Amino acid sequence: MFDIMGAIHEAICLILISIASWFFNLYYFIIGHVASSDVVGGSFHNVFGNETVWNIVSSVHQTVVIPIAESILALFMLVQLIKISQRIDATATLPAVKDIVFLAVSYVLFHWLIVNSLGLLDAVYGVFNEITNSDALTGASIQLGNMTLETSGLDLKKASIGGCFILVITAFFSAGTGLIAYIVSIAVATARAIQLYVMAAFSPIPLALLGFEETRQSGISFLKNFCAACLAGAIMMFLFAAYPLILTSMTASLGVGDLNQLVNADSSVNVTGVVDSALEYAFAPLLGLLMFIGLSILLIVGLVKAGSWAKEILGS
């Protein structure tokens, strides 16, 4: 005999599970493609997809910043000449040959650093970019984008409407958190790219400051901060690569990978080793599903702190 109530029950559960499946698949798609932009791992000339912004950086570097840096270098040479003349007046002797040679070598070295500063920073970025684009990171970061919520083996007769409804709510918030993670990742990666370009455009000035003992630490700090900004891209890619692995391992321990466990009112999901109460038993699937949201928030926090972590690694 045809069970009308059972058919209605299964139809409602199927609709709810289909909605939840769509949200979860959207979540997987968003997080899986969060690292696909060139802003994180693109070449220094094509961080924004083309060389338009790079041409602006190069133009500002050549026409505006280099003359300022050369003026600073000229001031450095003047200060050194004054020091040499003071020693001549104090000792009434000609300067040693080594002083003249040191002054000439210093000028040639710092002039070369100023003129070629853009190429030097490009090479430094390339070294860190090799880490960012290594197979160990880029290969793992796309795993989550190929994941989908499997519903083919679902037994609708054992599913509960309440469990399916909780699944929809959690899937909705998971997709929303994934959208936020994507927006934050794009914002952080773009801000990092702009920071790198600004530092590259004005790099001749801190490099020229290396000539003065009083300002030498400023030039060293600039180089360390630029390396930290480059390393931040590798840290972000590491987060993208580690995230799906952490998500898979932690949610698997709660049975989240089995959809029957999530919606079946008669299933047993072990959260703490032993389900101590009926309330904990009823909401155990919800605890596992909420882990999606918690781990996505963790990803957002990690992306925001990637720059500070890079500075801590380099001691800058």
Q: Can you name each region flagged by the protein language model?
A:
Residues 1-72:
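Binding/recognition "hotspot" determinant
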Residues 208-224, 312-315:
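Alpha-helical transmembrane segments
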Residues 5, 12, 16, 20, ...:
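Non-cytosolic segments of integral membrane proteins
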Residues 72-105, 202-217:
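Hydrophobic transmembrane alpha-helix segments characteristic of membrane transport
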Residues 66-79, 295-299:
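Hydrophobic alpha-helical transmembrane segments
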Residues 1-16, 93-113, 219-232:
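Alpha-helical transmembrane segments and their helix-start/interface "positive-inside/aromatic belt" motifs
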Residues 57-66, 98, 102-105, 191, ...:
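Alpha-helical membrane-interface segments at transmembrane helix boundaries
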Residues 71, 75, 79, 107, ...:
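Hydrophobic alpha-helical transmembrane segments in multi-pass membrane proteins
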